[in-house]
Amino acid sequence: MITTIEDLHEHLQWAIELEHATIPPYLCALYSIKDGSNIESVEVIQSVFIEEMLHMALVANIMIATGGSPKLDYPEFIAKYPTPLPHSDESFQVDLNKFSPESIECFLKIERPANADAPSQDEGFASIGQFYKALEEGLVYLSQKLGDKVLFTGNPDHQVTAETTYYGGAGHLICVTDLNSALKALEEVVEQGEGLDHENIFDGDKNMFHPEREEVGHYFRFLEILEGRNFQIGDTAKSGPSGEKFIVDWDQVHPMAANPASEDYTDNPAVLEKLTTFNQEYSDMLRVIEKSFNGEPKLLGQAVGVMYELKILAKELMEIPTGDGKTTVGPTFEYLPRKISDSEFIEVRENGPYVVHGDIPLIRKKRITGQKGEAIAWQKTKTHESDTIYELCRCGKSANKPFCDGTHDRINFDGTETARTSKISETQEILQGDGVRVKVDNSYCMHAKFCFNQKSGIRKLMAKGADDDAKIHVSAMTERCPSGTCLLYTSPSPRDKRQSRMPSSA
């Protein structure tokens, strides 16, 4: 149950993970279709993929509106396939596979509506709609408990909207400013196919490729492929599609091997290089999307351009034989960290400023606090305009902070480092819980107050051991600690799967 802002942000992050987990499988099926064939099926999969991107943006807008910071740049964000849907009941596995009846059956399981009376489920859900119902209930509860002015503190200018980003698919980008707009954003996601029970199979939008047609939800679009026939007005879930027939040719497909991994090609440098190029491009694209979700919404357009490059790379991979005489290579969708350029570094000048090299953005954030003074979230307030190389004040006396204005020369600043150089192992304290531990080093503390909330402090929460609710709060506290005082280390176990997916400061 979602009862705090920390819970809400945790579950919104899960929703972003969940939406993203469907994208690599959809793209593998889409890219495996040979050019010029299966036109209708290509349109279906492409439309669903585009809407999954929309759903990520809508969820991110809710997170931004409530003071959160969406994250896409951490290794666990890209699932290792085959995998169950993140935070689901794990009743089925999702594969990276070619376009086939089996892959479409898998997509139907992903998008299946729940029964109308299915309860909300914030974890271990059978359908995505149950999870979104829990998000809706959490938003309503927090709005009633805190009021919209306390709950919705984020800067709307940081959201991805029609004013910042061109969106050519069905549905709408919604700027979230209060409970009503947040619920509309969730409704957009649910009605496009990840919903509860559709007595009406149409989602209220026009088909993006055929504007004269009403659009059906994701589940029913994939059903059209299996049936080789479109739904039309008057059709129902029980009747099935009765509209125009179309050709589905399962043979006009690159025979990509299921669930490829880079480790399968360590003895083939040429293939490994292509896989690395694809994975670096994909990981870099996620980093651009993360930036667009954190105050630079216009950057999202760059990610669209990268998608075309990824399509070319994926199709090149799918033409390379694996060597078994039957299958070809395929994209592996594996996380790679950002390449650090030799030109990116911070120079500490003697008795002078910090000199930042490499066009590194300088961002100012402020703390959002609760009624008891506890820190709830970081809110981005400004990205400073700066050159590729810029100087930051180290003497503390600049009149143009955070930038250096030369004051250090006038006051004869002594820049001798006085920080302690003790080994971390000698100064840190380890708080041990069941399946999770936190390393605390108070010598780094800057008193940002993220290590306690209305319920408790991090030490008391750690003492609760296996309490899942306590672990959620501990993860949120350590993830937001700006100084590195509190670092979260997890020991994943079968009954502690949520923690293994959480981004942390460690």
Name what the model sees in each region.
Residues 416-436, 453, 457-479:
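Ferredoxin-type iron-sulfur electron-transfer modules in oxidoreductases and energy-metabolism complexes
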Residues 43-44, 372-387:
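A cross-kingdom feature marking solvent-exposed beta-strand/loop segments within repeated
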Residues 1-337:
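Non-heme di-metal
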Residues 392-402, 439-455, 468-484:
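Cysteine-centered iron-sulfur cluster-binding motifs in ferredoxin-type domains/subunits
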Residues 339-360:
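Short helix-coil boundary/hinge micro-motifs
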Residues 489-496:
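Conserved small/polar residues in nucleotide/adenosyl-binding loops
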Residues 13, 341-345, 389-393, 438-443, ...:
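Short, recurring structural edge motifs at helix starts
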